[in-house]
Amino acid sequence: MTDKYLAYGRLIRDGKILFIRRRPGSFLGGHWELPGGTVEPGEEPAETVVREFAEETGLTVRVTGERGNRSWDDVEGRPMRIHATVYALTEKEPGEVVLDPEEHDAFTWYTKEEAAGLALADHFREAL
C-alpha cells in the first residue's frame, strides 16, 4: 500500500472561511472544499498549502498553525492510504480570488455556521 499526502488551508477573512468548488466533470465535481492539494516529492506539507493556495486562488498566504490531520483508505479502492493536514492561514496581502478554471468554477466565503450546510469531506469539516 502506498501513501499519498495532502495539504489544505483554512483562510478566514472578515469572519468567513474561503471555500472553492470543484469543476463539474472532475473528481468530486460540484463539491466544495478548502484550497490545497498533493504534497510533491521533497516538499513539506506547509509549503504545499502555500503553493496550492496561490495556484488555486491567486492569494498569497502564510501558515499560522495546524487545524487537524486525518487519514483514510482510498475511496476508489486503490491500494493507497490518504493523509490530509489542514492548516490555519493568514493572507500576506489582501487580494482578489482568481480561480484556476481547470480545477474550480466558483468560490464563496462562509461562516462556520453557514458552512455546516455544505457537503464537505470529514477532514474539512473537522478543521473548521
What do these predicted ranges mean?
Residues 1, 9-10, 24, 77-79, ...:
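Short secondary-structure boundary/capping segments
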Residues 61, 70-96, 108, 112-113:
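Active-site-adjacent beta-strand/loop module that shapes the phosphate/pyrophosphate-binding cleft
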Residues 4, 12, 29, 34, ...:
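Short connector loops at helix/strand junctions that flank enzyme active sites
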Residues 56-63:
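Short secondary-structure junctions
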Residues 98-128:
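NUDIX/MutT-family hydrolases
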Residues 1-18, 86:
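Conserved N-terminal beta-strand and adjoining loop/helix that marks the start
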Residues 15, 37, 51-52, 64, ...:
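Structural detector for helix-capping/boundary residues
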Residues 16-55:
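Conserved Nudix-box catalytic region and its N-terminal flanking loop in Nudix hydrolases
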